[in-house]
Curated annotation (Swiss-Prot):
It comes from the Bacteria. One of its GO terms (molecular function) is structural constituent of ribosome. GO terms for cellular component: ribonucleoprotein complex; ribosome. Pfam families: Ribosomal_L36. The lineage of its organism: Bacteria, Pseudomonadati, Chlamydiota, Chlamydiia, Chlamydiales. This is Large ribosomal subunit protein bL36. GO terms for biological process: translation. Residues 1-45 are annotated as: Disordered. Belongs to the bacterial ribosomal protein bL36 family. Keywords: Ribonucleoprotein, Ribosomal protein.
């Protein structure tokens, strides 16, 4: 899964934008290698 500050979804390639637990994810059932997650704030220690 790629993690980047800004993610882009391409619906023509089967991408879907999903919000889970306050984070944005791109999921793709046709091509699972296209999974992405938007990087949020750093975790508190």
């Amino acid at each position: 899964m790629k993690v980047s500050s800004s993610i882009k979804a391409d619906p023509s390639k089967g991408d879907k934008l999903v919000r889970r637990k306050g984070r944005l994810y791109v999921i793709n059932k046709k091509d699972p290698n296209r999974k992405q997650r938007q990087a949020g704030p750093a975790r508190k220690k």
